[in-house]
Amino acid sequence: MESQCDYSMYFPAVPLPPRAELAGDPGRYRALPRRNHLYLGETVRFLLVLRCRGGAGSGTGGGPGLGSRGAWAELATALAALASVSAGGGMPGGGGAGDQDSEPPGGGDPGGGGLFRGCSPLLTHGPGPATSGGATTLPVEEPIVSTDEVIFPLTVSLDRLPPGTPKAKIVVTVWKREIEAPEVRDQGYLRLLQTRSPGETFRGEQSAFKAQVSTLLTLLPPPVLRCRQFTVAGKHLTVLKVLNSSSQEEISIWDIRILPNFNASYLPVMPDGSVLLVDNVCHQSGEVSMGSFCRLPGTSGCFPCPLNALEEHNFLFQLRGGEQPPPGAKEGLEVPLIAVVQWSTPKLPFTQSIYTHYRLPSVRLDRPCFVMTASCKSPVRTYERFTVTYTLLNNLQDFLAVRLVWTPEHAQAGKQLCEEERRAMQAALDSVVCHTPLNNLGFSRKGSALTFSVAFQALRTGLFELSQHMKLKLQFTASVSHPPPEARPLSRKSSPSSPAVRDLVERHQASLGRSQSFSHQQPSRSHLMRSGSVMERRAITPPVASPVGRPLYLPPDKAVLSLDKIAKRECKVLVVEPVK
């Protein structure tokens, strides 16, 4: 009987007509526009049409069993169909994994375009229709029976296919629903198989109607997602670039979020059934919550965001949280992240939107323990004396001495600039004068905060950075030695802001012990860098004398301080012309 029927599958590109219209005009589905591709994650509604060959209603040419109207009507009303989907047409692709960039997140030139890393999709699904109980189910409809054909409205979801699947194989199984025999209901198949031979038990089912129809359709992947992470003034920022690279149709971005991936915090289940947490990885009791990443508003960040073919859009996120870690927090906390993009196209007749989850690079929260901040009033007028307040928050260790040294001439050190760029930078450096370039703040205990005011004067208009050239010198060890041979009085003709005098004073102050200085100048790639608070190890003077003053607790002697524990925050001032 199966060979006496024709089977056709229709995938309409528009919503299906109401059931009453299909029943009144069964051939209406032929006029509907068809789809030649599907989207991974969507829920697809389609029609399976089973048509009897040779005209069942005429009673001729139908063959045994289907040659009469009554036989066809009896079979058509007893048929049922079920659809399933599987991956077909080759192995799944990489899902964007091949776009991964070897450049670590946060490093390099902020203006570079090659720092975006490809993010591979993990899961793609659609919301589907929700029942009153909140569960997502697929609708099941009875077939529409006409004179010579049966129409099965079917629904299948493409959210269980692996990411990167190129084609979907949709299989529909059609069978005749039989009334279960009374002996089977009373005794069950197990008891019947124990008392009868299997051939006798299933002989009646061998003649039942069974057919299977399948087709292959192209699957379009979700939008491409690329990520770039960097840190500015201690704030963790993430830029997500969404690109419509695979569809010629317009897609709309309805929402995009960044969430911590708590599932990545757990090790595989142990043999005894216990689960362990990974060290230094954020988990549900950690510091980063589901709402820690906030999308920053932009000029074109309203939803929905349309993307035509090969168009892209950037979204900026900031990790909100305290700069100082709470008590008992782990140092160097690693936060695995995922991005969730809600998108849709006009060619989704049944699915309102699709949700795609992407794997993002992890964020490492290396919170500095020694932070220098600066603040001043802005704007100021030219030739007006203004004060910059520097605050040092020390949660690292005890220091014997802390000094601030204004060193604008070091800004060009190690940089290869053309003559025009050199003149422009020199003009900018000469625009701000520091009245007190050498500042000794004394000792600093762990857990304390030092505040110091430095006077400046601007000679030209413009926007100037006042924390970049303020070098921070920290003395952290002491040792007995001979006094420095060059500790002689300064000449009256020497300016206190000249490099020669500052170098002499620094060597004289080096007699207090071993020190280390930090600035915002760009270090070489061999140095350890912390994105957003880039620092450079300038000099380490050997211990030459013992300090005089209040005794402090000092940790064991170290060659250098860890650069990721010290940070400087920028401070800019706007200089304008005086009001006449």
From Swiss-Prot:
Residues 90-138, 480-533 are annotated as: Disordered. Pfam families: TRAPP14_C (PF23652), TRAPP14_N (PF15806). Signal peptide: none annotated. Broadly expressed. High levels in brain, cerebellum, testis and whole blood. One of its GO terms (cellular component) is midbody. Residues 124-137, 492-502 have a biased composition (Low complexity). Residues 512-525 have a biased composition (Polar residues). It is found in: Cytoplasm, Cytoskeleton, Spindle; Vesicle; Midbody; Cytoplasm. Keywords: Cilium biogenesis/degradation, Cytoplasm, Cytoskeleton, Disease variant, Phosphoprotein, Primary microcephaly. Specific subunit of the TRAPP (transport protein particle) II complex, a highly conserved vesicle tethering complex that functions in late Golgi trafficking as a membrane tether. TRAPP II complex also has GEF activity toward RAB1A. TRAPPC14 is dispensable for TRAPPII complex integrity but mediates RAB3IP preciliary vesicle trafficking to the mother centriole during ciliogenesis. Modulates YAP1 activity as transcriptional regulator. This is Trafficking protein particle complex subunit 14.
